């Protein structure tokens, strides 16, 4: 079963931790999009991010994915570099410097 919780970086955003028991609709979209996705914008009352917990990621990698997806929501942008910059700032402000370095080093910005 998926865990649904508030994002550790913004309590106005729901976070779904996707596992093998998660709805196939969500898993299919994750398989197309990568390790996470964000649902936000016009008509979405509460933004939702989904983080793929099936991949055996480290805690820092999971934090990096969550922060990147929160970056999409907070910036209101689907642009990857914009979300990446916001994610790095979010992680640094929260003291997660190793996770921020993961985003810095992956080549999006």
What are these regions (language model features)?
Residues 17-59, 70-73:
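Active-site scaffold of zinc-dependent metalloenzymes
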Residues 8-10, 14-20:
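Terminal helix-to-tail segments of small alpha-helical proteins
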Residues 78-109:
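Post-HExxH zinc-binding segment in Zn-dependent metallohydrolases
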Residues 1-2, 109:
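Short intrinsically disordered terminal tails
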Residues 56-61, 77-81:
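Soluble non-cytosolic domains of exported or imported proteins
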Residues 64-76, 84:
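Active-site recognition of the HExxH zinc-binding catalytic motif
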Residues 2-10, 38-42:
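Short acidic-hydrophobic surface loop/beta-edge motif
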Residues 4-5, 68, 82, 90:
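Structured N-terminal alpha/beta-domain signature
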